[in-house]
Amino acid sequence: MTDNPADNKVFNEVSSLYKQYFDYAINVRKWLEIPDDLPHREIGYGMLKKVDNRNMSFNTNGEYLAWVLKESPFHLYKSLSYMEYPDVVGGAAKKGLIKREVAFDIDTHKTEKCTHDDSWICEECLGEARNQVLILIEDFLFPDFGLSEKDLKIVFTGNRGYHIYLKPEDTKKIGDTKLLEKIEKWEKNERRYFIEYILGKNLNLRNMGSRWKNILIREFKKNKISTKKFEKTSDWKTEIDTRKDNVRREIYETIGKVKSRLELDEKVMDDDIRLLRTIGSLHGYTGLMVKEITYSSLKSNQFDPLNHGVFSKFHKIMYNVNIKQEIDPLTLKGDTFDHKSTEIPASYLLFLFGHGIDFEILE
């Protein structure tokens, strides 16, 4: 690749593919998310970097969509916060926060079963991301907060993760106030307490709450740790101290493993002006779609990121290439490619480009 991307054949081809995608996503399928209350939302984007620019805003949907069609960014974002002055530079204080969406970002790393490089993806690490979403929803959001599938928006990020937005229906209320209005007015410290509770950072073994108590008792039973006395008391510290050294060690190890099950990006909950990927865009590192899915499709394992996350039209456009470095295999829509592949679809070409792989397009 030359120093000037505009002179590079691969960069120009990738740019053309992104333009084709956005034209289809906006004009044909209406896939691209237009953030609610657009004039009060900050927009950001990236081309060769994850974020090249932010502090942008648009007054109308038409103006926004025209800009996306013209620029066709590789990474596209919107702010979780609604702001009085979203285009002002200088942080939350100057932007004038009105309210903020509440969302979780699960971003997994390679697992012990993965055989690839840290930056690559496969069924194993994507499966781990799925499992973590289900833990978050089924162990906390459903039982603790009385939410249902209709109260959540689940989005595949286009890489090894998911965004889970809390969008309680209007019927969910605290007193006379709608639950959605309540949580979107949370201050930073309230959001911080929320995520720390889910991560077990507030866990007090001398005064165990019922949710964490039930979760840990379930895990103790899996490890054949006697739970009768734990079920009858909230002072677990005293009970743990009565156990033999090896049992005590196993109990603390089990608690530690359970607390570390979720790879949540805490900054997404903490940061007042956090940006998240726009639904219906492409992920610039993988070329996969940032796609909203249902809880039921995730639960039943019907959603396959390496199949349903691929823009189908890009799997039919083929290129002759020379891949100049050794790389791990990747399977997209059932087809496996690696550094020995000489004919590849646009879907794989975007993945190679996003990962900075050295390759050339042949005539």
Swiss-Prot record:
Which UniProt keywords are given for this protein, alphabetically ordered? DNA replication, DNA-directed RNA polymerase, Magnesium, Manganese, Metal-binding, Nucleotidyltransferase, Primosome, Transcription, Transferase
For this protein, what is the EC number?
A: 2.7.7.-
Gene Ontology CC terms: DNA-directed RNA polymerase complex; primosome complex
Keyword check for Membrane: no
Briefly, what is this protein's role? Catalytic subunit of DNA primase, an RNA polymerase that catalyzes the synthesis of short RNA molecules used as primers for DNA polymerase during DNA replication. The small subunit contains the primase catalytic core and has DNA synthesis activity on its own. Binding to the large subunit stabilizes and modulates the activity, increasing the rate of DNA synthesis while decreasing the length of the DNA fragments, and conferring RNA synthesis capability. The DNA polymerase activity may enable DNA primase to also catalyze primer extension after primer synthesis. May also play a role in DNA repair.
Subunit text: Heterodimer of a small subunit (PriS) and a large subunit (PriL).
Query: Which named protein is this?
Result: DNA primase small subunit PriS
User: What organism does the UniProt record list as the source?
Assistant: Methanococcus maripaludis (strain C7 / ATCC BAA-1331)
